């Protein structure tokens, strides 16, 4: 009976510490999901607040800075119609976080419909109370690609 009670007590302590550690991770996952929606909606005002002034964006056809990325989204040169997120992983180290999303992206690029499998790497930095995106990189992958957790 004592061993069962000890096991349950240790399990609860471990479980509660896991939830405490994952609050920031959940915030980042939600922020990443919101970002996909804002990109789809072409909501450059919200994206402008999220993207750090020195943010970089790496696509299959080039690398852009913040203002260029916002203009591409605003004008619809790339329309991120829908990102279907299949898996997400988060790692936090100090005030820096990396979010990996395994997605299928439905987009319109130069008036052509494109459906592409990506693993997207997002780098965030905690600045005051807010997370700011420093980098976003699209890596084209096979549909069987999995993120290591």
For the regions a language model picked out, list residue spans one by one.
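Bacterial N-terminal signal peptides
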Residues: 7-16
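A beta-strand edge to alpha-helix "cap/lid" segment located at domain peripheries
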Residues: 21-49, 54-149
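Positively charged n-region of N-terminal signal peptides that target proteins for export
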Residues: 1-5
């Amino acid at each position: 009976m004592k061993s069962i009670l000890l096991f349950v007590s240790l399990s609860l302590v471990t479980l509660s510490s896991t939830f405490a550690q994952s609050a920031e991770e959940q915030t980042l996952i939600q922020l990443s999901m919101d970002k996909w929606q804002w990109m789809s909606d072409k909501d450059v005002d919200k994206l402008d607040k999220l993207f750090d002034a020195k943010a970089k964006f790496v696509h299959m056809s080039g690398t852009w800075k913040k203002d260029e990325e916002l203009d591409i989204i605003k004008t619809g040169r790339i329309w991120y119609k829908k990102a279907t997120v299949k898996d997400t992983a988060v790692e936090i180290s100090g005030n820096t976080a990396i979010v990996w999303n395994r997605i299928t992206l439905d987009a319109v690029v130069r008036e052509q419909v494109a459906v592409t499998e990506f693993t997207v790497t997002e780098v965030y930095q905690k600045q005051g109370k807010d997370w700011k995106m420093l980098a976003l990189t699209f890596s084209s992958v096979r549909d069987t690609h999995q993120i290591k957790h």
